[in-house]
Swiss-Prot record:
Residues 1-753, 809-814, 883-906, 976-985 are extracellular. PANTHER family: ADHESION G-PROTEIN COUPLED RECEPTOR, LATROPHILIN CIRL. The record marks 727-728 as: Cleavage. The gene is Cirl. Residues 275-299, 1294-1309, 1439-1464, 1630-1655 have a biased composition (Low complexity). The lineage of its organism: Eukaryota, Metazoa, Ecdysozoa, Arthropoda, Hexapoda. CDD domains: Gal_Rha_Lectin_dCirl (cd22830). Residues 25-114 form the SUEL-type lectin domain. SUPFAM superfamilies: Family A G protein-coupled receptor-like (SSF81321). This is Latrophilin Cirl. The modification Phosphoserine is found at residues 1142, 1239, 1246, 1310-1311. Proteolytically cleaved into 2 subunits, an extracellular subunit and a seven-transmembrane subunit.
Length: 1693
């Protein structure tokens, strides 16, 4: 490494000053001396040898001689350099000889550059001090500001450890702060009136005299970066030299001025490595010939450009005057010295305080003010307000007239935020040495000196005297010298005891001296040294103490070892807790390390613990107070020309030594590699606002801390545990965190912090949306285990995101830190467990019957809950019991301490759950692949596709979540260790976490067609949402029902309206009345009807009579006007609604209740005040107007067959509903309470009944346009093919065509869920079919088409095959001569309701009275199975031709046999009244076996039918597996329900029984009941309570009603007419079939004698027709979404 040259000036006061300079060259290098042209060299003195230990001693060798001198050195130099402009001399022993072998020498020359014409120089300055001119060693302390330029000394020390500062570090062609080329600097003895300049290279300018020395500029004693390169441009002429007596304060301000050659150059910040040189540097153009002028100079003048960090101060007008007075450091007192005012950039030099020899120095620099100073940064825009310069300033260079003025303003703006400051915090007294320590140094070098006496005196001096920086260097050197001499002198003592005693005493003195140096009272002495010297002194102290300790260990004999109870140690711990109970720092050496370093069975170990050494052995840039260092480093580029340099961008990593220094050494050497690492436990000195601990050791060679060979095992708030594979001095380094930023986000840059907030926010929002979707739209989802699993997963993820967001904002000192870590641990374990259970559930679904029908699995879900949360809480509890501190010892509140407990309780469980989830996922894929190769039915294919999609999404979900958690973990670990890859993991976490939230929303919400539909409905139904979301081109989505005012009940909408149609039955006056027209609602589209939110309610407005129609508004009384047998009510008067949400379905499951703008007709009023309504057909107002321009009445429409036949058929839309008056109370009947219930309104929908008293709302099921109407009496007129006589062929062809279309439509369904739903409808419909009935005879003129009418069964849009003959009860109107009869549908129950299915035979009165329910029921079931066999086995419904007479006769025989079987079953029920319960159970078992066999036979026949359908390319009729499952479910329920009936059976009144249990010889359809989730928990309990209550009070029927009661009132209420008949029409039709007396007699008998035996009523006289009040039943089905769908049975013709 090349040395560099530096100049140190001594202050001279003279009118004619000659510069005195000093040059050095290390041994083996060439000393070059050069003066300016016209000047010659005048040597004063020279020496080849060594007078200082610091010059040319980069490695700090203290054993060289410092009294080495070659006497003829000056003569040799004079022969080479005297009176020459330049010369070069090689510093080598071949030139000068070897005055001191073994010592590295250097050549030192003191000279002057004088004019060649000058023969003598007269000066008035005082003589230099003797130590300058003498041959003795200079009192320049270690590295006393001597910088070695290239080519002169050893290599330069390494650059300071500073991070790269943007905009400051110099690059090629632009030297910056840390890339300073070697240059010569001058140190000025700073008196206010002194003015000298030292020019680099030893060239003297302006005739000034100076002394110069050499210095190395690469490092600073204060650890700060060296100053930037300063340029001082000169324009010299031999004869043109300004007067040296001209004061600088009188220099004019302004543009280019002539200034003396000795004008100072101001600097901005810090100087070179050691403080012996000022930043007053000048730079001349090399080898510039005489007479040439520099750029920008004025002829005849010497122009000097003054700069601070390349800022032209001449342009700023600061070359003199009052502005320059601001750039001075004020006078102050420090270290018993008075420091006078000093110019910025100068170094104030003065003699050391009293009692010490040498010089003291202190530099004045510019430092930026603190943020609270109130000064603002410079604004470049302010330059626009700079006044224009005067014209006189632009005479010589008009092109550069404006820039100097603008530049002056810029400089003023930049400099105003800075203030002159003494730097460093204390003066540099490295060269100050006390006289008594100099005396001790002389004594120790004497041969006959007493080492013990010297050591005692040294300990006394260091404890009682004031020391300076130079004294530290001398003291540590004496300690090493004493130890070396004692090592040689101990052999002169023959007595072992005397030898040990002397060395023990010497060690005590050395330890006392070291303790005195580290005492707090001597802290100022350490601060007198620059950082480099501090490190050297500390290293020397450590090595000296260690050397003396080993000296004692070598001296003590083995017999002197104290005896212990056990002499064999597995390990050694220092310090011993018994001896040092207050120490918390520990070093533990393993046994293997002791054995490897033993000698003769003994091991020499030296332990040392140092106090306050951590304040000396500081890392770089921490030698002065933290506030000043932060300000200094932040403003290193204070005056850079680059205006983009922002001080805030310069980020400095401040590190401190945050533990005591503890040392351990073995006898073989200092750096011994150990076979097993040692363990150190070090206590943190500072616990607040510190982070990132690092285990380090002190490197003796580099004089710095190093982390090689040491690693951090664990850490917490107070301690850190380290592991090192070698021995030396150890400590902990930690980063200082700003007090205002002490959370985890301190390691985030601004952008990453914002991105993390955004990422977590997005994920939380989408998780909340998913949870709300599960809650609000619960009717869409099946209440299954999968839904519960995903709900739990989302809850865990939400907790993790929120806890992570809270944890990164907390510190380890926060009270919530430990709790956050605990809950986060539990949430992560629970989340991974739920993922494992989700994969297991998919696997179990594929391996069980759950593939067919996904239902609620409460036991399994409860087991998942127990395993998930139970295991997680157990693991966390165990972790807390073992080591609670593991949750509080980490730096961040989102991580546990990385120890064995962390891996056992966190990593291992998470990995187990993830591996299990992946394993079950792969098993599920294998099973799906196997099933895909086998032949499955449509239902299994649909469910398999759904499960396949769920598994794919779950697997992607699992991988994405793993990526999120792994990236977060590695990011936090990397940021803690300051790893460069931490930012990569951080941005990966941001991306993955955002994708996780988006994936949750897309997977669970967007991809589900049902959810999308519910979202649309939900948006349409809420008026608070913006219209842009709720409105569309064709519909308006929100219907707002107002309850006040005269227009109450109308639908408020903004949709596109059609032309209002005149309601049926409204007179012409009403049509002409504008007020009446306003009350007529405006028809809107179906979307508006579907989107309406109001329930069907009573109009509570005050009663008033309409002017024209005479109707009563707000009541349910029968109106006064009728039209054609129709009793007309005004729309909007009695009821106000266009549709409503089903009370027990989900919020979005809205079904159309009745068509908008249609009249409601009150049929009759029941005994309890019920009013029965139906809505007549509204074909008339949908059809185009005829030529007459008026609307037709229903009778006129149907009488016009030709017009009906030619008009396009519309969808069938008819419905019934029932209302009860609001009694003001709607409480439910309490258990055990007798009497009449508070209100009959609590039967089905307690919530809706409370407000609107609507009990049941069956909505319509539309038939396809073009299908035959459902009106039997008009079927002939509306069906043209029937008139042609080709009905059989026509309907056969139409049936085949429709089945193909339906099959094609099913294949084009939009989703697997829709296919599953369609298929479930078919299966449930066929399984819920009752027994076959005797079909009524067709009209006489249609008798020849009897078989065709039987074939034409109604097909709703969900069917994919024909309904069987067992469904005849379902479409009696169709069989009687009308195809496509109306079917009414409504969702009655969902998750919260308990739905059960019943057969009408279960309520049979005979069986209840005779306690023989089971026999009758199963005989009926056998009849139903027989009907099913004929249904699936025969060809009447297979789609082929069935027009032969033999098939018709066979079908009649089967029907007769079934009728006889029903009669026999009833007789058997009567005959077995006295049988006991055991026999009944046997019969039940026998019937169950027969049922099972029948179902199996039916399945075989069904398979054959399926093959026949497959041959025609049509879908199969049903699913065998589903039918079998449902049959078993029905069988089990029937047994349990019949037992309940027998337990509570009692003689019941006719009116108290359900309507389905009355006399019904033909109707045996399926009915069902619904309870609202209360009572005894099921419909069976509710029905049992109903029976008991009705048995007690027969005249007050109440409680919960079966649905059948609403439509089949038997003897207790009026019947409900079909859609196309009024009661008058029905009575006329019945009177044609039977005499009026028979009907009256039957009706009178039924009402007057309720105590007759039910058997007598069940079998009336064969010539006696049934009463006109025929019962109507409902068919119920439960689809896979747990949705009950009801179908109203049309009344037989």
């Amino acid at each position: 490494m090349l040395p560099t040259i530096l100049s140190i000036s001594y202050e001279h006061i003279s009118l004619d000053l000659s510069k005195y300079q000093t040059a050095y060259a290390c041994e083996g290098k060439k000393l070059t001396i050069e003066c300016d042209p016209g000047d010659v060299i005048n040597l004063i003195r020279a020496n080849y040898g060594r007078f200082s230990i610091t010059i040319c001693n980069d490695h700090g060798n203290v054993e060289w001689s410092v009294n080495c001198m070659f006497p003829k050195s000056l003569s040799v130099l004079n022969s080479r350099c005297a009176h020459k402009q330049s010369c070069g001399v090689l510093a080598a022993t071949s030139m000068f000889g070897d005055p001191c072998p073994g010592t590295h020498k250097y050549l030192e020359a003191h000279y002057q550059c004088i004019s060649a014409a000058q023969t003598s120089t007269t000066t008035n300055r005082p003589s230099p001090p003797p130590w300058v001119l003498s041959n003795g060693p200079p009192i320049f302390g270690n590295g006393s500001g001597l910088i070695h330029p290239p080519g002169v000394g050893a290599g330069a020390p390494p650059p300071p450890r500073l991070p790269t500062l943007p905009g400051v570090v110099g690059i090629s062609g632009n030297p910056g702060l840390f890339n300073v080329p070697p240059q010569h600097t001058a140190v000025t003895h700073s008196t206010p009136w002194s003015s000298t300049t030292a020019v680099g290279g030893g060239r003297l300018k302006g005739g000034a005299t100076s002394t110069t020395t050499t210095k190395h500029p690469a490092g600073r004693h204060d650890g700060l970066p060296p100053p930037p390169q300063l340029h001082h441009h000169h324009n010299h002429h031999g004869e043109d030299t300004a007067s040296p007596t001209k004061p600088s304060s009188k220099l004019p301000a302004g543009g280019n001025v002539t200034s003396p050659s000795n004008t100072r150059i101001l600097t901005g910040v810090g100087g070179s490595g050691t403080d012996d040189g000022t930043l007053l540097t000048t730079k001349s153009s090399p080898n510039r010939p005489p007479g040439t002028a520099a750029s920008g100079s004025v002829a005849g003048n010497s122009s000097v450009v003054r700069t601070i960090n390349n800022i032209n101060l001449n342009a700023a007008g600061m070359s003199g005057g009052d502005d320059e007075s601001k750039l001075f450091c004020g006078p102050t007192h420090a270290r018993n010295l008075y420091w006078n005012m000093t110019r910025v950039g100068d170094v104030n030099v003065q003699p050391c305080p009293g009692g010490a020899a040498g010089i003291a120095k202190w530099r004045c620099v510019l430092m930026k003010r603190m943020p609270d100073s109130g000064y603002d940064e410079y604004d470049d825009d302010a330059s626009s307000t700079t006044p224009a310069p005067s014209g006189g300033d632009c005479l010589h260079n008009s092109s550069s007239c404006e820039p100097p003025v603008s530049m002056a303003h810029k400089v003023n703006q930049r400099l105003r935020n800075f203030e002159p400051t003494w730097h460093p915090a204390t003066p540099d007294l490295t060269q100050c040495r006390s006289l008594w320590l100099n005396n001790l140094e002389m004594r120790v070098n004497q041969r006959d000196s007493s080492l013990i006496s010297i050591a005692n005196d040294m300990s006394e001096v260091t404890s009682s005297k004031t020391l300076y920086g130079g004294d530290m260097l001398v003291t540590t050197k004496i300690i090493q010298t004493v130890s070396e001499k004692m090592m040689h002198d101990k052999e002169t003592f023959p007595d072992q005891r005397q030898r040990e005693a002397m060395i023990m005493e010497l060690l005590h003195c050395v330890v006392k001296t070291g303790s005195n140096l580290l005492d707090e009272s001597q802290l100022s002495s350490w601060l007198d040294l620059n950082p480099e010297d501090q490190m050297r002194v500390a290293t020397s102290l450590l090595t000296g103490l260690e050397y003396n300790a080993f000296l004692l260990a070598d001296t003590i004999s083995g017999s002197a070892v104290w005896c212990k109870k056990s002499k064999i140690y597995s390990s050694v711990v220092f310090p011993d807790t018994d001896q040092w109970p207050l120490s918390s720092d520990r070093i533990e050496l393993p046994r293997a390390a002791l054995i490897d370093n033993s000698e003769g069975g003994l091991v020499r170990i030296v332990f040392a613990a140092f106090d306050r050494l951590e304040s000396i052995l500081k890392p770089s840039y921490d030698h002065f107070d933290l506030k000043s260092s932060r300000s200094y480093v932040r403003n290193t580029a204070i005056l850079s020309n680059d205006s983009d340099v922002n001080a805030g961008e310069i980020q400095q990593r401040l590190r401190i030594l945050n533990s005591k220094v503890i040392s351990a050494s073995l006898g073989k050497g200092r750096h011994i590699q150990l076979s097993q690492p040692i363990t150190l436990t070090l206590k943190h000195l500072k616990t607040e606002n510190v982070t990132n601990p690092t285990c380090v050791f002190w490197n003796y060679i580099d004089h710095a801390w190093s982390a090689n060979g040491c690693s951090l095992e664990s850490t917490n708030r107070t301690h850190s545990v380290c592991s090192c594979n070698h021995l030396t001095n150890f400590a902990i380094l930690m980063d200082v965190v700003d007090e205002h930023q002490h959370s985890l986000f301190t390691m985030f840059d601004g952008n990453m912090r914002i991105f993390i907030y955004i990422s977590i926010g997005i994920c939380v929002v989408f998780i909340v949306i998913a949870l709300l979707t599960l809650k609000l739209f619960n009717g869409v989802f099946v209440k299954s285990a999968r839904t519960s699993i995903y709900t739990s997963i989302y809850l865990c993820l939400l907790a993790i995101e929120l806890l992570f967001l809270l944890g990164i904002e907390q510190t380890e000192t926060s009270i919530f830190c430990g709790f956050i870590t605990i809950f986060l641990h539990c949430a992560i374990l629970s989340g991974t467990a739920w993922f494992c259970y989700e994969a297991f559930h998919s696997y179990s679904t594929l391996t069980s019957d759950e593939l067919l029908l996904e239902v609620d699995q409460t036991p399994k879900v409860n087991c998942y809950y127990l395993l998930s949360y139970g295991l997680s809480l157990s693991v966390v509890a165990i972790s807390l019991v073992i080591d609670p501190s593991t949750y509080t010892q980490n730096d961040y509140c989102v991580l546990m301490e990385a120890n064995a407990l962390f891996y056992a309780t966190f990593v291992v469980p998470v990995l187990v759950f993830f591996v299990a989830a992946i394993g079950y996922t792969f098993l599920s894929w294998i099973i799906m692949c196997r099933k895909s190769r086998t032949g499955l039915k449509t239902k299994e294919h649909t469910r398999l596709a759904s499960v396949r999609f769920d598994i794919r999404c779950s697997f992607v979900f699992l991988l994405l979540l793993s990526a999120v958690w792994c990236s977060a973990y590695f990011y936090l670990r990397g940021a803690k260790m300051d790893d460069d890859t931490a930012d990569v993991y951080g941005y990966c976490f941001i991306c993955f976490n955002t994708l996780l939230g988006l994936y949750i929303f897309v997977f669970h919400c967007i991809q589900n067609e049902k959810i999308r539909r519910e979202y649309r409905k939900y948006v349409r139904q809420h008026a608070w949402l913006p219209k842009c979301l709720r409105c569309s081109k064709t519909s308006i989505s929100s219907g707002i029902v107002t309850g006040n005012g005269p227009t109450a009940g109308t639908l408020c909408s903004v949709s596109t309206s059609k032309k209002p149609k005149l309601p049926l039955g409204v007179s012409e006056e009403a049509h002409d009345d504008p007020q009446q027209q306003q009350q007529t609602p405006v028809p809107i589209t179906e979307d508006a009807i579907m989107g309406a939110t109001s329930d069907c309610e009573l109009n509570e407005a005050q009663q008033r009579r309409t002017l024209k129609s005479g109707l009563m508004t707000g009541t349910l009384q029968a109106p006064t006007q009728t039209l054609g047998g129709h009793v007309v009510l005004e729309r909007g008067s009695t009821l106000r609604s266009t549709g409503h949400a089903s009370p027990t379905s989900s919020a979005g499951s809205t079904h159309l209740i009745f068509a908008h703008k249609q009249q409601q007709q009150q049929q009759q009023q029941g005994p309890l005040g019920e009013s029965y309504y139906h809505q007549p057909d509204y074909y008339s107002w949908k059809q185009p107007s005829t030529g007459t321009g008026g609307l037709k009445t229903p009778r006129e429409y149907y009488n016009n067959a030709g017009a009906a036949a030619s008009s396009p058929q519309q969808a069938h839309e008819v419905f019934y509903w029932t209302q009860k008056p609001n009694s003001g109370q709607h409480g439910k009947k309490k258990r055990g309470a007798g009497g009449v219930p508070a209100s009959p309104s609590g039967s089905l929908h307690s919530r809706t009944a409370a407000a609107s008293q609507v009990l049941f709302y069956p909505s319509y099921k539309k038939t396809k346009p073009g299908q035959p109407t459902g009106y039997p009496q008009y079927a002939e007129a509306l069906d043209p093919p029937l008139a042609t006589g080709n009905a059989a062929a026509y309907y056969q062809q139409q049936q085949q065509l429709r089945r193909q279309q339906l099959h094609q439509q099913q294949q084009q369904l939009s989703s697997d869920e829709e296919q599953a739903e369609q298929h479930a409808h078919l299966l449930h419909l066929q399984r819920r079919a009752g027994s076959q009935q005797q079909l009524p005879a067709p009209p006489p003129h249609m008798a020849q088409y009897q078989q065709e009418f039987m074939q034409r069964q109604y097909r709703n849009k969900h069917s994919n095959c024909d309904l069987g003959m067992g469904d005849a009860y379902y479409n009696q109107g169709s069989v009687g001569g009308a195809d496509g009869g109306p079917v009414y549908e409504e969702i009655l129950s969902n998750r919260n309701s308990d739905v059960q299915h019943y057969e009408v035979g279960d309520f049979d009165v005979d069986e209840v009275y005779n306690n023989s329910v089971g026999t009758g029921v199963f005989n009926n079931m056998r009849a139903a199975v027989a009907a099913g066999g004929s249904r699936y086995g025969g060809g009447s419904l297979s789609g082929g031709s069935v027009s032969s007479r033999s098939q018709q006769q066979q079908l009649k025989k089967q029907q007769q046999q079934q009728s006889l079987a029903q009669q026999r079953s009833v007789r058997r029920c009567t005959a077995d009244d006295d049988d006991d319960e055991d026999e009944e159970e046997d019969e039940e078992a026998t019937a169950a076996e027969q049922l099972h066999d029948s179902v199996c036979d039916e399945d075989e026949e069904e398979d054959e039918s399926d093959l026949e359908h497959d041959a025609h390319g049509l879908p199969p009729q049903s699913d065998e597996r589903m039918r079998r499952l449902m049959a078993m479910q029905d069988e089990d329920f029937k047994r349990r329900f019949q037992r309940q009936l027998r337990k509570h059976g009692a003689p019941l009144d006719y009116g108290a029984l359900p309507p389905g249990a009355g006399p019904q010889p033909e109707h045996n359809g399926a009915v069902f009941g619904v309870s609202g989730g209360v009572g005894e928990g099921s419909m069976r309990g509710a029905f049992r309570q109903q029976q008991q209550q009705q048995a007690l009070n027969a005249k007050s029927p109440g409680g919960r009603l079966a649905v059948n009661e609403l439509f089949g009132h038997g003897n207790s209420g009026p019947p409900l007419p079909p859609a196309n008949q009024t009661p008058a029409q029905k009575r006329q039709q019945l009177q044609k079939l039977s005499p009026q007396s028979t009907t009256s007699s039957s009706s009178h008998t039924s009402h007057s004698n309720p105590n007759l035996h039910p058997h007598q009523l069940t079998h009336p006289h064969p010539h006696q027709h049934p009463p006109h009040h025929q019962q109507r039943h409902l068919s119920a089905m439960l689809d896979e979404n747990n949705t009950v769908r009801c179908y109203l049975e049309p009344l037989a013709k």
